A protein has these predicted regions:
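RNA/tRNA-interacting regions in translation and RNA-turnover enzymes
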Residues: 14-76
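Covalent nucleotidyltransferase
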Residues: 53-121
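Intrinsically disordered, low-structural-confidence terminal and linker regions
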Residues: 1-19
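Generic secondary-structure transition motif, activating predominantly at the C-termini of alpha-helices
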Residues: 12, 35, 100-103
Length: 121
């Protein structure tokens, strides 16, 4: 049994739970609030528009990749990718690596863009 969802189905090397499956209501509320209050303000700006469209001051920037907003969540020692729609992914290599890297740390939520790199060929 996971702290994230009641049931999962196989998903590659891990497991996934469908839309609405994310169990902790407080976590889901935080993910939805982040999407509503922060992610909706993300902007794509061409280099020649930076001085016109971006306000002065301290800013956080990142490269846009064609992914989806997901969160890496560590809760009660378990690590999962969780979406604002309530989907959950556990047990994939990225989750296992994150669990190793975050060992000894408390609960955490990290916003990011989930995407897959397709091997050339």
């Amino acid at each position: 049994m996971s702290v994230f969802a009641a049931s999962f189905e196989p998903y590659g090397a891990g497991q996934k739970a469908p839309i609405g499956a994310l169990a902790p209501a407080t976590i889901k509320a935080r993910l939805v609030a982040y999407k509503r209050n922060v992610a909706k303000r993300y902007r794509i700006v061409a280099p020649d528009q930076i001085s016109d469209r971006i306000p002065e001051g301290n800013l956080y920037i990142s490269t846009k990749v064609d992914g989806e907003l997901w969160f890496l969540v560590k809760l009660q020692g378990e690590v999962a990718f969780c979406s604002p729609t309530g989907r959950v992914i556990v047990g994939i290599p990225a989750c296992i690596e994150a669990e190793k890297q975050l060992s000894g740390e408390g609960d955490i939520i990290v916003a990011g863009e989930l995407f897959a790199v397709v091997p050339k060929g």
